[in-house]
A protein has these predicted regions:
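Short, charged/polar surface micro-motifs in flexible loops or helix N-caps
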Residues: 49-54, 63-64, 79-81
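Short, solvent-exposed beta-strand edge segments and adjacent coil->beta transition regions
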Residues: 2-7, 67-71
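A short beta-turn/loop motif at secondary-structure boundaries
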Residues: 36-38, 63-64, 99
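Core segments of cupin and vicinal oxygen chelate
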Residues: 2, 9-52
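Vicinal oxygen chelate
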Residues: 13-16, 66, 71-114, 119
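Short, charged/polar, Gly/Pro-enriched secondary-structure boundary elements
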Residues: 51-55, 112-115
Length: 121
């Protein structure tokens, strides 16, 4: 019935600042950036490394306040390596914690949206 989750809307205050964070800190690739609706609003679509699901940095959903997205899980086969690379990019990321399902670390974007980086057992 469904193929996949194509896009996840990430609510942000400042689209340009958020784009810089997601591309420089997380290594996302800019797919497209164009005017959207009002002159101050952009359609910014990003690709996560090696993922099918894309991110859209949104400001136009009043019910989605910046920082309201929590618990989006990114997976990796080698959390220690990924964690070290993100720390080298000056990402404020938690220490790696052992959980019943594997290893995980958490971080937030500048708007407070919460992410989980996970390595399964």
């Amino acid at each position: 019935m469904f193929d996949r989750i194509a896009l996840i809307s990430i609510p942000v205050k400042d689209q340009k600042a958020a784009k810089k964070f997601y591309t420089e800190k997380l290594g996302c690739t800019l797919i497209e950036e164009m005017p959207f609706g009002t002159p101050d609003t952009l359609w910014i679509r990003l690709a996560l490394p090696r993922a099918d699901t894309e991110l859209v940095l949104v400001t136009w959903f009043p019910q989605m306040k910046p920082g309201s997205v929590q618990g989006v899980v990114l997976t990796t086969k080698n959390l220690a390596d990924t964690h070290a690379k993100l720390k080298a990019r000056k990402l404020d990321i938690s220490d790696i914690k052992k959980q019943p399902w594997g290893l995980e670390a958490t971080f937030r974007d500048p708007d407070g949206n919460g992410w989980v980086l996970q390595q399964s057992k």
